[in-house]
């Protein structure tokens, strides 16, 4: 299994590590990108409070607004992950 490769972030190291762990678990247990994203979002909503947004895929563009300190963009293998929280 590939390790996460960080591309951009505005997040604490602790929260980044939690998201990396959740994402690695999700890719090991689910095949569909939608299922991977749903797992990560549901876990973060419970552990960090709502309202999280998770986008997972091989090809997408984005332009989002996020809460300060709650944004991370990274890859695991060929999959890109965009994870952020809004108020």
From Swiss-Prot:
One Pfam family name is Dynein_light
Q: Name one GO cellular component term.
A: nuclear pore
The record ties this protein, via SMART domains, to:
Dynein_light
> Can you say where in the cell this protein is located?
Cytoplasm, Cytoskeleton; Nucleus, Nuclear pore complex
One record GO biological process: microtubule-based process
Q: Which UniProt keywords apply?
A: Cytoplasm, Cytoskeleton, Dynein, Microtubule, Motor protein, mRNA transport, Nuclear pore complex, Nucleus, Protein transport, Translocation, Transport
Q: Give the GO molecular function terms.
A: dynein intermediate chain binding
PROSITE patterns, per the entry: DYNEIN_LIGHT_1 (PS01239)
Q: Which Gene3D superfamilies match?
A: Protein Inhibitor Of Neuronal Nitric Oxide Synthase
Which SUPFAM superfamilies has this protein been placed in? Answer: DLC
Cited InterPro entries: DLC_sf, Dynein_light_1/2_CS, Dynein_light_chain_typ-1/2
Q: What does the sequence similarity comment in the record state about its family?
A: Belongs to the dynein light chain family.
**Oligomer and partners:** Homodimer. Cytoplasmic dynein consists of two catalytic heavy chains (HCs) and a number of non-catalytic subunits which present intermediate chains (ICs), light intermediate chains (LICs) and light chains (LCs). Component of the nuclear pore complex (NPC). NPC constitutes the exclusive means of nucleocytoplasmic transport. NPCs allow the passive diffusion of ions and small molecules and the active, nuclear transport receptor-mediated bidirectional transport of macromolecules such as proteins, RNAs, ribonucleoparticles (RNPs), and ribosomal subunits across the nuclear envelope.
Q: What does this protein do?
A: Acts as one of several non-catalytic accessory components of the cytoplasmic dynein complex that are thought to be involved in linking dynein to cargos and to adapter proteins that regulate dynein function. Cytoplasmic dynein 1 acts as a motor for the intracellular retrograde motility of vesicles and organelles along microtubules. May play a role in changing or maintaining the spatial distribution of cytoskeletal structures. Also a component of the nuclear pore complex.
Q: What is the protein name stated in its UniProt record?
A: Dynein light chain 1, cytoplasmic
